[in-house]
């Protein structure tokens, strides 16, 4: 990690991928459920090749009134494992399933349960984790048959072995995975001491770390956060509809009021097909348009071949040893940033807004420090949007390029080697690792190329002093000095 910038040790790139430690699930981690109904499990859309657990689960949904004769999809074995396949032609925005709120797993369900009292002060995601663990152990749980179809683990990197994680050597995803696992472990150990042990009768014995990671993985991969007034909800059957990069909208899940049984009304989780689908084809949704491949790997255990999903996070920091620390921090905070700022850079996209101004702020020093005076406080960010001085611009370019080269040196393979490996028959986890390595390096090379080009243009850039002189009418369009400047300095 290079020490850069005048006035202190600033490490702009900590190779950090997740922003903070609030692991309330991100956007819709979806897969949804279907509804059918008929006289037998086979007649409501299941197939003989489905496991007994899935068939039992389907029958339970039928008994709960979730599956009706009108349900246009069936559970089927597909390339991804299980999925939803159309029983008939489905038009775009057709409703394919509805699930009543009484079957949702969310903080309200926790609050209404026997453990609600002891979980009332917990972060919502932690209370739901405890609820999942407890309900899975109960023979009389409403969700017994739902838990029967859930996997013990997925290909999410939180479940990888040490040997498998070594394939991510040098990557941000490896560091993020280790950080997430350590964070979850610490939170769950606190839960054990503060909630489980003082209330042993409410929880299974023992509750292991594996139980915590199972529940965390279920929540991370299945929690849906885009319903009205619902930030954390798991909907049974939400893990059967699969993701497709071909779906480019996320507007497919709704909370509606409707019939939830023969004589009852309730809020319903309603899922619409985002695309027109022919009978026999699989129905897909888009899990999240904004997630990088690293986030997809961490949350769901897969990546897309789409290069635009490749990303790298630059972490910039104002060093406390910087002689202008207080002023720089004030400027950063006044413009929506903090002492540490994270910038996600995606392949084939422009640099994110705020990155260059923040870099220039961190690098600011020497004769450029006058911009930190209170006189400029309301206008400094506008000045930082443009090049300040040659020294400042050269310093930030050098810092970024050195950080990129340092990061690239941390991988144990080259892009060419990764691409050669991809031609082989890789298992799912190795394929993820190779794809992540390749993608991160592609973005790092892109960043390095951007700032290499900026270095080549340093002599052609217009800097603050030249712009100021032009504003005063003392500098021509070609940069020629006009008149006697002595009286202005």
From Swiss-Prot:
Catalysed transformations (reactions): L-lysyl-[ribulose-1,5-bisphosphate carboxylase] + 3 S-adenosyl-L-methionine = N(6),N(6),N(6)-trimethyl-L-lysyl-[ribulose-1,5-bisphosphate carboxylase] + 3 S-adenosyl-L-homocysteine + 3 H(+); [fructose-bisphosphate aldolase]-L-lysine + 3 S-adenosyl-L-methionine = [fructose-bisphosphate aldolase]-N(6),N(6),N(6)-trimethyl-L-lysine + 3 S-adenosyl-L-homocysteine + 3 H(+)
Give residue ranges for domain SET: 64-288
* Xref: InterPro entries: Rubisco_LSMT_MeTrfase_plant, Rubisco_LSMT_subst-bd, Rubisco_LSMT_subst-bd_sf, SET_dom, SET_dom_sf, SET_RBCMT, SETD3_SETD6_MTase
User: One MF term in GO for this entry?
Assistant: [ribulose-bisphosphate carboxylase]-lysine N-methyltransferase activity
Subunit description:
Homotrimer.
PANTHER family to which the protein is assigned, alphabetical: [FRUCTOSE-BISPHOSPHATE ALDOLASE]-LYSINE N-METHYLTRANSFERASE, CHLOROPLASTIC (PTHR13271:SF113), UNCHARACTERIZED PUTATIVE METHYLTRANSFERASE (PTHR13271)
Q: Give the function comment from the record.
A: Methylates 'Lys-14' of the large subunit of RuBisCO. Can also use with lower efficiency chloroplastic fructose-bisphosphate aldolases and gamma-tocopherol methyltransferase as substrates, but not a cytosolic aldolase.
Q: What is this protein called?
A: Ribulose-1,5 bisphosphate carboxylase/oxygenase large subunit N-methyltransferase, chloroplastic
